[in-house]
């Protein structure tokens, strides 16, 4: 994997920094694991905008990823690594001994030809998936379930990982990248190793159009709007907003805590540090 800084042949190329991975498959994805992905433009079924800054972008197929890793005891071979436009991580196409193919998240160091397996008897090796009760304390894992059998929810983006710091009874304690310490049932599965493509954070798109290719529309500042559109809007000339930062609906923002799910607070041993 290489980090390439483009030559400034035009203003739009001047700031571009690309991540080039020669190990990625250059052909089409495996057709049997693709699904239709329709554009919403950020609108719901009534036509109202429910998610701002969404619209346009290149047409994409969704890749069906195996987040459950429930094909126990059947060894699989990594056929190839692929780019996935739907996530920051790369994905790996696995061919299992029974002939089935599945996509999984590509772990750091994973290459074509590697063997992976899941289940309670799997070796402690990068890419293998096991229940947390069978993973040694101190191990680094990714793609962690929060409920047994539901599928991975924690640490799925590029470069992400969590560490198993303790195991007590029916719960394992995990340290997340944010600094949060969280309890998860020991029957939940996790995949050993870190998610690959950690260099993703170093890329620079270089121009606004590259964001538009990805389906991201511009973000307009509240102080640039009219009073009818935003609490910060209006005023003669340029103003600073005149109040603490709020969303277009008047809810405080920029650091204001909105978590109110007290039902699951008991699973958080220590809140995140930021």
Curated annotation (Swiss-Prot):
SUPFAM superfamilies: Nucleic acid-binding proteins (SSF50249), Translation proteins SH3-like domain (SSF50104). It comes from the Bacteria. PROSITE patterns: RIBOSOMAL_L2. SMART domains: Ribosomal_L2 (SM01383), Ribosomal_L2_C (SM01382). GO terms for biological process: cytoplasmic translation. It holds the Pfam family Ribosomal_L2. NCBIfam families: rplB_bact (TIGR01171). Part of the 50S ribosomal subunit. Forms a bridge to the 30S subunit in the 70S ribosome. PANTHER family: LARGE RIBOSOMAL SUBUNIT PROTEIN UL2M, RIBOSOMAL PROTEIN L2. This is Large ribosomal subunit protein uL2. It comes from Shewanella amazonensis (strain ATCC BAA-1098 / SB2B). The gene is rplB.
């Amino acid at each position: 994997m290489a980090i390439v800084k483009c030559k400034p042949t035009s203003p739009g190329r001047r700031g571009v920094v690309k991540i080039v991975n020669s190990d990625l498959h250059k052909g089409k994805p495996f057709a049997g694991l693709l699904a239709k992905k329709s554009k919403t433009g950020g609108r719901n079924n009534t036509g109202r905008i429910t998610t701002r800054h969404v619209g346009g972008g290149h047409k994409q197929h969704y890749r069906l990823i195996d987040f459950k890793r429930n094909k126990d005891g059947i060894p699989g071979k990594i056929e190839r690594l692929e780019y996935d436009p739907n996530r920051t991580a790369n994905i790996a196409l696995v061919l299992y001994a029974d002939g089935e193919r599945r996509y999984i998240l590509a772990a750091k160091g994973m290459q074509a030809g590697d063997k992976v397996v899941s289940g309670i008897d799997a070796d402690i090796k990068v890419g293998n998936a096991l229940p947390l009760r069978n993973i040694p304390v101190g191990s680094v894992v990714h793609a962690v379930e929060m409920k047994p059998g539901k599928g991975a929810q924690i640490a799925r983006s590029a470069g992400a990982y969590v560490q198993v710091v303790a195991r007590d009874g029916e719960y394992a304690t995990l340290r997340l990248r944010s600094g949060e310490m969280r309890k998860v049932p020991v029957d939940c599965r996790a995949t050993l190793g870190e998610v690959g493509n950690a260099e993703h954070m170093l890329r620079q798109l270089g121009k606004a159009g590259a964001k538009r290719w990805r389906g991201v529309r511009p973000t307009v500042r509240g102080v640039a709007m009219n009073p009818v559109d935003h609490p910060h809007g209006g005023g003669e000339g340029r103003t600073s907003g005149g109040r603490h930062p709020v969303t277009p609906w008047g809810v405080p923002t920029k650091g204001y805590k909105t978590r109110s799910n007290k039902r699951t607070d008991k699973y958080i041993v220590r809140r995140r540090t930021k």
